[in-house]
């Protein structure tokens, strides 16, 4: 019989179940068993194997009856969510049709991870490529960011019925759903298809749930449960579960009850933290804008304020529709202060864009004299910090043309060489990467376990390269391989990598010593995602202990002080857009972090990992929550905290079974009885309402105790 998730007994049953799985894992680790389960036990980390087993075991109950249809895999970035999902896809492919939904740039990541997994599963096989082709044929890939995503899904499987749906970077899907003004967007159509699907299993992979707003939980858990588990309207959700006065969760106990059984969390266990490099405290560089830059910035702010006033009132009386954040109807037309934020990075009077000319081309045409401390104090400050780095450096900006491309020009002027690939060719066992200066970079058998590694490069040149959303996946993979080469341990091949939001997704980088975030964002999870590109399990294993550190930097443009105080009082903008974004991000981060803590407490591994605050109820077999969330809030909490304790009790045998009892004058009839629960492997109290309770009292009073 499978576990029932909407039940007070489920948390303790889960703890006992996972302990059994862990013991099995340890046995299989040492065995010579060649079964698929044993192979996965040897290939996976223990926290992966726990979820692998629970998800695929009907006894645990996923997909059974009214239980959840899947899991939110909330594992810290760099812990192997992709490997876990592929393991389940392989094991369940004879039952469910695996469909992998991810940004197109990440599809090759899945292929690489699949090959890595195959090598772990079948170390005795010499031709892993044949096994890769065999297994790959079972998978269907869909691009999350494609305009025709719906058509791709239909082509992949006809419908989502009978599918194992794996969504990577799932927070992007949740945000896309609540940012949609109607049901015509890709994200909203996928939501509706998932809600209507029958016999579907779901894996949502993300290291940063609730990154924008706690309301992201609504589409996530509604899709996992297959019903309206959480209220669809923003106002009702916030009224029920958010204390706006304290900026913290409200009715947290009732929300936890609804979420239990749908979350897997791994990330802050001590033994896992030891595998990560040390993240040093964030250095915030507040950089004063130059006079000319600040002048252009103020002009841009005037334009943005005028646009804001022109559109004000259009949506004020419109309440957010179902599954919409307030203001989603107008977000497509919002500038998000793009002008002023880009000028906060770079401003030059020499920059003019001709008709039919791309902004990136205009930046390339600028003379050397345009790239000075006056045009970008931020970048000049960043370059000074980069020169102190003993190893590879990662630079992030969400702006490509007036962010990353400008940084690239500064680097070239400083003498760095751009290794941006123009073409990747395959020639037998050799891969040739043609880069910007026209020379060839040859890599022979360039793989982590390859027998030889040969690079034809000048060791006297310091190089940088870029990965944005426009780069081809093959070129992206080659850059990642070059960065991760043992020959690049201190940046000898690629010293600096510039990435955009799209370019950064899915990157798995080693050896990085500094991360530079060129502008703040109101979503602090974005900054965590960037840092996680190089702060990963095992990413610094090849370095000596003193070098296993990563120093993050954040750059915030502040007003030119001389000009600021020359502006009439009352007309001054007290904080720059950078400062406002940073402060808003910290405020939002506090609320989002509090909700992420709730997800950790509701995770199925919480008690197994010995975490504090886990949802653990007395196993009374009562319903954990009422389907109607408003009525549920009015009802008493059925989850009575479970307290484990050793007590002195007398043994009694009744009808061939052993029980224990205490004389307890504080209880109505003077006795407390306990019976053994084989599921949780512990004794639990027998309630006075149980007919057995009276029978045991009579048995004791008759003087037949053992």
Curated annotation (Swiss-Prot):
Residues of the Helicase C-terminal domain: 417-599
Record keywords: ATP-binding, Helicase, Hydrolase, Late protein, Nucleotide-binding, Virion
Main localization category: virion
GO terms of biological process kind: DNA repair; replication fork processing
One Pfam family of this chain: SNF2-rel_dom
The organism's place on the tree of life at top rank: Viruses
Extent of motif DEAH box: 168-171
InterPro entries hit by this protein: Helicase_ATP-bd, Helicase_C-like, P-loop_NTPase, SNF2-like_sf, SNF2_N
Its EC number(s): 3.6.4.-
Protein's cellular compartments: Virion
Induction section of the entry: Expressed in the late phase of the viral replicative cycle.
Subunit structure as annotated in this protein's UniProt entry: Part of the viral DNA-directed RNA polymerase that consists of 8 polII-like subunits (RPB1, RPB2, RPB3, RPB5, RPB6, RPB7, RPB9, RPB10), a capping enzyme and a termination factor.
Cited function: Putative DNA-dependent ATPase required for providing the needed energy to achieve the termination of early transcripts.
Name the record gives this protein: Termination factor NPH-I homolog
């Amino acid at each position: 019989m499978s576990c029932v998730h909407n039940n007070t007994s489920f948390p303790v049953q889960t703890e006992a179940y996972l302990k059994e799985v862990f013991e099995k894992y340890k046995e299989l680790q040492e065995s010579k068993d060649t079964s698929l389960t044993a192979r996965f036990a040897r290939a996976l980390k223990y926290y992966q194997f726990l979820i692998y087993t629970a998800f695929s075991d009907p006894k645990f109950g996923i997909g059974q009856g009214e239980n959840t249809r899947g899991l939110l895999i909330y594992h810290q970035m760099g812990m192997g969510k992709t490997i876990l999902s592929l393991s389940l896809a392989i094991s369940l492919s004879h039952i469910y049709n695996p469909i992998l939904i991810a940004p197109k740039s990440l599809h090759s990541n899945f292929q690489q991870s699949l090959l890595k997994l195959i090598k772990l599963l079948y170390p005795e096989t010499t031709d892993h490529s044949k096994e890769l082709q065999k297994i790959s044929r079972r998978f269907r890939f869909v691009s999350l960011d494609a305009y025709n995503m719906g058509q791709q899904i239909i082509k992949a499987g006809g419908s989502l019925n009978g599918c194992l749906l794996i969504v990577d970077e799932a927070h992007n899907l949740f945000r896309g759903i609540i940012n949609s003004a109607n049901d015509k967007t890709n994200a909203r159509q996928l939501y509706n298809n998932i809600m209507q699907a029958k016999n579907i299993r779901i894996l949502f992979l993300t290291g940063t749930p609730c990154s924008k707003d706690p309301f992201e939980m609504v589409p996530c858990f509604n899709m996992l449960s297959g019903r309206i588990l959480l209220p669809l309207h923003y106002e009702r959700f916030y009224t029920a579960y958010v204390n706006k006065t304290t900026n913290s969760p409200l009715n947290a106990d009732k929300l936890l009850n609804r979420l239990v059984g749908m979350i897997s969390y791994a990330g802050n266990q001590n033994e896992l933290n030891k595998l990560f490099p040390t993240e040093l405290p964030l250095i915030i560089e507040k950089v004063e804008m130059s006079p000319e830059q600040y002048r252009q910035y103020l002009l841009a702010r005037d334009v943005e304020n005028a646009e804001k006033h022109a559109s004000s009132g259009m949506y004020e009386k419109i309440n957010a529709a179902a599954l919409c954040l307030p203001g989603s109807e107008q977000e497509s037309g919002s500038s998000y202060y793009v002008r002023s934020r880009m000028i906060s990075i770079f401003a030059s009077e020499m920059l003019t864009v001709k008709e039919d000319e791309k902004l990136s081309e205009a930046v390339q045409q600028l003379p050397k004299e345009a790239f000075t401390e006056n045009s970008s104090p931020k970048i000049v400050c960043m370059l000074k910090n980069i020169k102190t780095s003993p190893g590879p450096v990662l630079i992030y900006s969400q702006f490509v043309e007036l962010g990353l491309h400008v940084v690239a020009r500064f680097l070239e002027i400083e003498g760095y060489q751009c290794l941006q690939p123009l073409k990747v060719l395959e020639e037998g066992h050799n891969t040739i990467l043609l880069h910007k200066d026209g020379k060839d970079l040859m890599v022979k058998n360039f793989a982590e376990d390859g027998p030889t590694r040969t690079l034809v490069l000048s060791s006297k040149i310091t190089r940088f390269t870029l990965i944005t959303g426009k780069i081809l996946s093959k070129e992206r993979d080659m850059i990642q391989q070059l960065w991760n080469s043992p020959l690049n341990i201190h940046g000898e091949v690629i010293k600096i990598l510039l990435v955009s939001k799209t370019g950064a997704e899915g990157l798995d980088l080693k050896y990085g010593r500094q991360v530079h975030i060129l502008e703040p964002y109101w979503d602090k999870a974005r900054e965590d995602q960037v840092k996680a590109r190089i702060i990963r399990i095992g990413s610094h294993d090849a370095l000596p202990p003193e070098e296993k550190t990563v120093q993050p930097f954040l750059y915030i443009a502040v007003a030119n002080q001389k000009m600021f105080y020359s502006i009439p009082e009352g007309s001054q903008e007290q904080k720059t857009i950078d400062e406002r974004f940073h402060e808003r991000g910290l405020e939002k981060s506090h609320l989002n972090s509090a909700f992420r803590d709730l997800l950790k407490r509701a995770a199925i591994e919480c008690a197994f990992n010995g975490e504090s605050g886990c949802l653990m109820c007395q196993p009374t077999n009562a319903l954990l929550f009422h389907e109607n969330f408003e009525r549920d809030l009015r009802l008493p909490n059925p989850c009575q905290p479970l307290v484990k304790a050793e007590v002195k009790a007398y043994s009694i045998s009744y009808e061939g079974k052993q029980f224990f009892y205490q004389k307890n004058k504080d209880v109505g009839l003077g006795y407390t009885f306990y019976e053994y629960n084989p599921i949780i492997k512990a004794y639990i109290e027998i309630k006075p309402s149980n007919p057995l309770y009276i029978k045991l009292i009579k048995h004791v009073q008759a003087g037949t105790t053992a």
